Amino acid sequence: MLLLPLLLLGVILPGGDNEDVFQGPTSFHLKQISTFVNSTWAQNLGSGWLDDLQIHGWESDSGTAIFLKPWSKGNFSDEEITELVDLFRVYLIGFIREVQDRVNEFQLEYPFVIQVIEGCELHSGEAIESSLRGALGGLDVLRIQNHSCMPAPDSGNRGQKLCALLSQYQGTSDIIERLVSETCPRYLLGVLDAGKAELQRQVKPEAWLSSGPTPGPGRLLLVCHVSGFYPKPVQVIWMRGKQEQPGTQQGDIMPNADWTWYLRVTLNVAAGEAAGLSCRVKHSSLGDQDIILYWGHPTSIGLILVAIIVPSLILSICLALWFWRRWSYQNIL
C-alpha cells in the first residue's frame, strides 16, 4: 500500500510533467442490482464502471464476467482475475440465499430490489477513497468506509440490523474490506494505465444549431447541439456579444456508442430577440479556440451556397474535360 501514492503520481502526471494533467476517469465502481420477485425467483445484474464508462458486464446465467475492452483487466494476471470472478460468483449466489432467508426478519415485501455499489476514487494530491454503499429500492441503507459500517440516516432499524449482521460474519467483513481498500485501488491504477491511450484521448466536438418546438406565440426555442466530444467535461453557453444569456437550459450529457458524449442546450427567446445570439462551446480538445455559432448569421447561408456550388463546379469541369478528350480523339481519327 505504501507504493500507491507513487503509482498515483505516475497515473495523474505521466512522465512527471505537471502540465500533463490527467483528463480521463478518476473512479472505478462495481454495481450490483439484485431483483427479488418472489421467494423462489431472483436475479443478479452486475457491471463495472470507470466514472460513466462501462468496461465490465456480468453474465448472470453462467456467472462469468464480460470484459468490454481489451484493457479491462488492467494489470491483473489471469490467475487474479479468475480468483476474483470466482469470488464474486460465490458471493452473488450466497447473497440471494441469505436475503431470501431473512425476508421476514428485515420486514421485506416481494417484489423488491437491492442495489450495492463498491469502489474507489482518486483525489489529486490525496489518498484514494474507497467505500461500499447498499440501498433498498433506491434508498440508502448502509455505508462501509474506513473499516466501519454506518447505517444511513433514514434507514431506520434496517441499517442498524444489517451492520450488526455483518459484524457477526468477520470473514465476510474482512473480504469486503480487502476488496474495497486494497484490491480496488490497485486495480484502478492499473486499468487507468492499461487504457490510458483511449482514456486520455482528446476528441473535438461537432456543434450545430436548430430550432425546437415553438414554446408559445412569438417565441423561439433555440437549440445548440454538441456531439462527439471526449473527455466528458464541456461548457456550452448561449451568448449575446460577451454576455451570457439567462434562461439557458442544459440537458443531461448523454453517451454516444463510440464513448463520446452529446449535449443539448436550449434558450427560449422572443422571436425578435434571436438575432445576434450565439452559442459558445468550450472543451479541452479545442484549447483556446472555442467554437462559436451565430444564430441566423449570413455565414451559414454562405457555407450552404459553397457546399452546393463547389461540387457542381467540379462536376462541370470533369464533364468539360471528358467532352474535350472525346472531341480530340475523334479529330485524330
UniProtKB/Swiss-Prot annotation:
UniProt topology in membrane: Single-pass type I membrane protein
Sequence ranges assigned to domain Ig-like in this UniProt record: 185-295
Motif segment (Internalization signal): 329-332
Quaternary structure, from the entry: Heterodimer with B2M (beta-2-microglobulin). Interacts with saposin C.
Annotated GO biological process: adaptive immune response; antigen processing and presentation, endogenous lipid antigen via MHC class Ib; antigen processing and presentation, exogenous lipid antigen via MHC class Ib; positive regulation of T cell mediated cytotoxicity
Keyword field contains Membrane: yes
Annotated Pfam families: C1-set, MHC_I_3
Keyword Transmembrane helix: yes
Side Extracellular, residues: 21-302
Paired cysteines (S-S): C120-C184, C149-C163, C224-C279
Function as written in the Swiss-Prot or TrEMBL entry: Antigen-presenting protein that binds self and non-self lipid and glycolipid antigens and presents them to T-cell receptors on natural killer T-cells.
Subcellular location: Cell membrane; Endosome membrane; Lysosome membrane
Protein name: T-cell surface glycoprotein CD1b-2
